[in-house]
C-alpha cells in the first residue's frame, strides 16, 4: 500500500537530494538557499497532499484469469502454454477498466496469437505487495507449472523504504526459485515513481532516484538468477511523464488501461523469447513515437 508520509519523513536520502536541489538550480520554492530540513517539511506536506489526491483503492483489479485462444480461432490443438503473473498492484493491473486491458490478458492474448496455441493465464499478484510477499505468490503458482512467469514489483518497496539491495536480493531469490523449477521468468523492474504527477518537488525527485536505484539493483539480481529483466523506467518513464492524462488512471498513481497496454508491450518481446518464440515486436505500443521513451 502507498506509504508517502514514510517516504517523505524518514528517508535520509531525501534530505541529501533536497539539499543538493537547494544548492543547485535555483533551490526549492524559488529560494536558492533553502535548507534541507525545510525541504523535508515541504516533502511531508506534499506527501499528505498526494495521498489525499490518490486516495485508497476502493475497487479490486479486473479478474482476467482463463484460457486465451489465437484470434479468430474457437479451438486449437496441442499443449496449452501456461502464463503466470506475480507482483503488486501494477502486475494485478489496478486501474484498468476491464479484464481484457490488464497486463496479464494483453500478454496472454498476444502470446496465443504469436504461438498459435492456447494460453492459460493465472494472476497471483496482490495489491500492496512488496518483494518479500513474492514467496507466498510463488507457492500459489508452482503447482500449476507455468511455462513463463512475469513479475512486476518494486513500487511498494520504495514507498516503504526497503533498502534497494534487500528488495533486489529477495527478488533475485524468487527468480532463482522459479528457474530451478524450470520456469522462464520475465521481470518488469521498478517503474519511475517520479512520473507520478501528484508528487511535487523535492518528493518527486527523491521518489525517482530511489525507484531507479532499485530498478538497477533488480536488473543485476534478476540477470544473475537467470531471469530476463525489462527496464520499465527506461522504456516508459518519459512516456508516462509527458502524457499523464493518457497513461495514468483517475487516481493519478496507477496506470490506466492505455498505461497497462504500454507496460505489456514493453514486456512482450522478452515474454515471447521466454516462450521460445522469435519476434521483432517493438517495446512501445502502436501509435507511440519512438522519441517518447527514454
What is each stretch, according to the model?
Residues 1-82, 279-294:
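N-terminal secretory targeting modules
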Residues 48-124:
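Serine-esterase "nucleophile elbow" of acetyl-processing enzymes
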Residues 85, 151, 186-188:
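Structural beta-sheet core signal
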Residues 93, 123-130, 155-166, 203-207:
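Surface-exposed cleft-lining segments at the edges of enzyme active sites
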Residues 131-168:
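Oxyanion-hole/transition-state-stabilizing segment in secreted/luminal serine hydrolases
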Residues 181-183:
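A short helix->loop->beta-strand "cap" motif at the edges of active sites that frequently abuts
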Residues 194-294:
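Catalytic His-Asp segment of secreted/periplasmic serine-dependent ester chemistry enzymes
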Amino acid at each position: 500500500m502507498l506509504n508517502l508520509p514514510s517516504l517523505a519523513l524518514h528517508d535520509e536520502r531525501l534530505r541529501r537530494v533536497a539539499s543538493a536541489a537547494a544548492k543547485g538550480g535555483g533551490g526549492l520554492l524559488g529560494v536558492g538557499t533553502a535548507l534541507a530540513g525545510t525541504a523535508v517539511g515541504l516533502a511531508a506536506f506534499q506527501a499528505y497532499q498526494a495521498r489525499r489526491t490518490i486516495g485508497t483503492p476502493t475497487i479490486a483489479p479486473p479478474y482476467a484469469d482463463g484460457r486465451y485462444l489465437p484470434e479468430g480461432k474457437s479451438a486449437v490443438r496441442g499443449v496449452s502454454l501456461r502464463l503466470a503473473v506475480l507482483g503488486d498492484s501494477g502486475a494485478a493491473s489496478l486501474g484498468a477498466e476491464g479484464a481484457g486491458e490488464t497486463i496479464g490478458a494483453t500478454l496472454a492474448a498476444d502470446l496465443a496469437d504469436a504461438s498459435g496455441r492456447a494460453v492459460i493465464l493465472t494472476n497471483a499478484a496482490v495489491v500492496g505487495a512488496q518483494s518479500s510477499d513474492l514467496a507466498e505468490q510463488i507457492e500459489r503458482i508452482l503447482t500449476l507449472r507455468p511455462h513463463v512467469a512475469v513479475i512486476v514489483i518494486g513500487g511498494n518497496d520504495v514507498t516503504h523504504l526497503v533498502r534497494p539491495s534487500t528488495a533486489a536480493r529477495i527478488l533475485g531469490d524468487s527468480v532463482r526459485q522459479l528457474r530451478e523449477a524450470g520456469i522462464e521468468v520475465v521481470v518488469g523492474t521498478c517503474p519511475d515513481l517520479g512520473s507520478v504527477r501528484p508528487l511535487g518537488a523535492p518528493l518527486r525527485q527523491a521518489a525517482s532516484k530511489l525507484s531507479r536505484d532499485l530498478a538497477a539493483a533488480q536488473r543485476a539480481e534478476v540477470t544473475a538468477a537467470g531471469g530476463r529483466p525489462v527496464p520499465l523506467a527506461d522504456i516508459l518513464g518519459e512516456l508516462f511523464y509527458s502524457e499523464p492524462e493518457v497513461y495514468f488512471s483517475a487516481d493519478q498513481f496507477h496506470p490506466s488501461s492505455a498505461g497497462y497496454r504500454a507496460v505489456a508491450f514493453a514486456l512482450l518481446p522478452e515474454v515471447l523469447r521466454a516462450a521460445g518464440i522469435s519476434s521483432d515486436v517493438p517495446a512501445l505500443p502502436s501509435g507511440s513515437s519512438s522519441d517518447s521513451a527514454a
